[in-house]
Amino acid sequence: MTANKGLKVLGVIAGLAIVVMAALPTILHSAGLHPTYEGPTYELPGQRALIITTSHGVLSEPGETDGPPTGVAASELTHPYYIFTDGGMSVDVASIAGGEVPIDPQTFFYAVRSPEDSRYLEDSVAQAKVANSIPIADVDINQYDVVFISGGWGAAYDLAQSPVLAEQVTAAYYGTRNPVIGGVCHGVLGLINAKDTDGNTLIEGRRMTGVSDKQVKELGIEVTPLHPETELRRVGAIYEKQTAFRDMFATLVVVDDEQRFVTGQNQNSGSEASHRMMQIIAERDSS
C-alpha cells in the first residue's frame, strides 16, 4: 500500500469514527436510553415537591474510601426537577448530609446526556438548589405533596443507611398532606427501612421496582454495598422488572395498589415516574 492510499484509508476510518460518535446519542436513545415520555401531562400550581438525593460521591470498594467520583445520576435528578417545575410545582432539593450534591460526572457524558441534563447545565437556579441542598434532618416533610428519591451509584452508600431518611419516609406516608412517594433506580433503597405504625416494613407486600441485579452486573458495578432488586426482595416487597438485551435499555414504572408509592426501574424511568406521581395527585384532587 502506498503512503497516499494509507492516508486515504486512515481518513475514511477517521471520518466513520466521527460519524459514529456524532450519531451515538441517537443510537442509544433509539435503543431505549432516556425514552421520550408520550403520556398525559398535568399542572399542579401551588403544590410542592421534594427531591431527595445521595450525599456520597465516591465509588469505593468495601472498607475503602478512595475510588472514582460518583453521586446521583444526573437524569434521575433533572428529569423529575423539570417535570415538576414545568407543571407549576415548587421544588426543593434535599440530601442526606445537605450542601452540595455530588452528580456522577459520567452521566453528563455527551452520549448519555439527556435534554434535561443539558438544560440543567444552563440553569443557575437549579444549580444553586443542588449546591445548597437541605439536610434531610432539617426537612419539614409535611410541607410536600410529592417526595421523590433519586438514585445513582452513590445512593447505594447512604440512603438505606440513614435512619433519618427512613423516619422521614414514614412521616411522609402518615402525614397530613398524604403525599405520593417515589423513587427510581437506587433511589428506592431510601424506602426499605421505613416502618409502619406496628414497626413492620412499610413497603412489605407492595409492588415495586428498582434497578435490576442484571443491570448492576452488566455494568460491572457490583462493589456498591446494596443492590435494589436484592434489597426490595429481602424486605418483602413484590419486585417487578422489565428486561432487555442490556437492562440499561429497559424501563418500568410501578404504582402500588394504594397509589401511594411510584417506583421506576432505572435511569430511563424518571420521566414517566414523575408524571405518574403528578397524575395520582391531579386525579385525587379532582375527585
What are these regions (language model features)?
Residues I181:
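Conserved, well-structured core segments that form or line functional sites
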